[in-house]
Amino acid sequence: MDIRQAKDQIKNAMLAYFSKDEFGNYRLPTERQRPVFLLGAPGIGKTAIMEQIAQDLDVGFVSYSMTHHTRQSALGLPFIAKKTYDGVEYDVSEYTMSEIIAAVYDAMEATGKREGILFLDEINCVSETLTPAMLQFLQYKIFGRHRVPDGWIVVTAGNPPEYNRTAHDFDIATWDRLKRIDVEPDFAAWRDFAVETGVHPAVLTYLDIERDHFYRVETTVDGKSFVTARGWDDLSAMMKLYEEQDIPVDELLIGQYVQNGEIAKRFSVYYDLFTKYRADYQIERILEGSAEQSVVERAREAAFDERVSLMGLITDALGGRLRDAVMEERAVEFAHGRLAAMRDALTVDDANALPLLREEAASLQARLDTERKAGLLSDEKYVAYQRALALIDRALRCDAAGGGVPFSQVKALFGEMVDALDARIAAVSSALDNAFRFVEDAFRNGQEMLLLVTDLSVNRYGMAFINDHGCERYFAHNEDLLFYERGADLADRINRLDLTEDEA
């Protein structure tokens, strides 16, 4: 299965494992909660989806790579303890707490979360001396004498032996204790993730054209030659930073991430062409609705590669605006909730809110720091916390004369925040409408329109914005996309029917 399907499977398993009966006990006993084992090539996003699942479920997350662990670090260090049996004192062997189990307790203490995911990567690379202990751990969640705390679910991962020399296959006894999920590199699944997270449009459009360059591992006379999803994702982030600093993105940089000489060279050539398209088409003017007719005509006459690049530029620019608008809207909703709680805590209308503001600022900052340290701070939460803290900071500055801060003044500052959001939403709605107008003028209802509608549909920020604020052109063209998909499905069924009749 692809990484998107794997995420759904794991998330469903986590929900089942976390379910409790009427008495608060987990419905599936610990020894029957099979650890999930993700088996797949390196760099396809196994660790990333586990972090996302932990954030989605709002549970703790601890990640460990097993490659560097010895028997002592995994099980704990032995020491001599005194025990009395039948009135006779004996020296017995005990173990200190496992480094891994201790990390789980540390995470619980830091975040206050009693439930979480313990993710152990490269588990099929452990040393042979650790294998018997791992077998016990996989079934009973015990390292040495210490058990994984109740409420913490074990997920493991590893690479097949053909990708990792130190990896070894498990025997049937081990496989029979695991919930195995085989993950394959899949561009279509990664593309949805890339659109949502804002992967550089040059990377996205290049891979739209050269899909077989998405993931490749080869053995050459010079050693391994490879390119992975992780490589493209990391290259994308670096390209954005280079562009912000006006540092050239060249083949030397690309080759540090895309470790296949041929693909690195071809992408370097494509990127140079892409930057030319970006300068020529002036995407900002398209979204402002002020693109010149010559730009529309050039797009209409453009070759396939240029059209793909242009649509990538448009959807990337739209995606950034949609993401920012949705995150700001959720930040305003979060701030409204905090202010409502503050208002309810005041005993007198328009009372001095200064003590509550200070208390709220300290609480939010502590919450932000804790979730960041635990790796549970999503971008949406970060923006919400920072916007609320900025609002509180502005309110606290109103106490410059030492007379306190009436709640009405806090409400006025929040009103300015809402006005700024309304202006942003109006601007994004206009940009969305102008993008559809441009694509209609240049390409009518061609494949480019289907690409625009599809990219908006798989982008959760795009769909959140459109569902909340509407977009008539999106809904009209989405109907066309549904008819197209139904027609394609019908044609596929007819082809299968014809094939069956021929075979008969």
Task: Go through the PLM ranges and name each one.
Residues D8, N12, A16, Q55, ...:
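Charged/polar, solvent-exposed surface patches and flexible loops
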Residues R300-A504:
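Terminal-proximal interaction/regulatory segments of ATP-powered molecular machines
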Residues Q5, Q9, Q33, Q52-Q55, ...:
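Residue-identity detector for glutamine
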Residues D58-G60, V88-D91, V249-D250, I263, ...:
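Generic structural motif recognizing short loop/turn segments at the entrances and edges of beta-strands
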Residues I3, K20, S98, S127, ...:
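Short, structured coil/loop segments at alpha-helix boundaries
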Residues M1-D212, V217-T220:
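AAA+ P-loop NTPase catalytic core and its hallmark functional loops
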Residues E196-P355:
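Alpha-helical lid/collar subdomain of P-loop NTPases
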